[in-house]
Amino acid sequence: MFKVTSYFGALLSLLLSNTALQAQTAQMPAAEEFSTGEVLNSTPVMGDYYVKGTFGDWTLRCLKTEQAQDPCQLVQLMHSADGSPVAEYNLNPIQSDGLVLAGANVITPLETLLTQQLTIQVDDQNAKIYPFAFCMQMGCVARIGLTQEDLDSYRSGAQAIITMFPAAAPTQPERLTLSLKGFTAGHAALMGAAEN
């Protein structure tokens, strides 16, 4: 009895799968039901950020405006040990007062302990401490005035360590690596874009 039942079961299974395959073939959709996609316009529109160039670990990011020259900044995202983006460093051309030649913003998470401030140490040089200026929806901002000495150390350095403290763990500093690979070329491109 078992052999007969398994034979009929196998035959029934084969017939059902064959019927399903025929039904699937009969109901196969026509090619015109599928989209081949459209090419998106790669030209940025007003108010969009776009990448003007990449220099090592730095990106020259610009904002499309109605001006003859779009404002740009040199940007790098810094990541935690697990690879998650944590903070942004963006360098901006400024109207120099003779001492400060460039301005940078370091944007950290809202949960940053502001009273501990932020430190930046390029390679084995002495660290500098900077206050946070304000917080906004996307994070808290420390505004960094870069002197000629600072710019020279960025150009000749390999990396900077940026240290901040989470409010939830005020005794556990978060140290982020800012790569200086490509900084010299990126800074030159930023200043060239600002002058044009």
Language-model region placement:
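Bacterial N-terminal signal peptides that target proteins for export
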Residues: 1-9
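Bacterial N-terminal signal peptides
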Residues: 9-18
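Sec/Tat signal peptide C-region and signal peptidase I cleavage site
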Residues: 19-23
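A generic "folded-domain core" signal
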Residues: 24-196
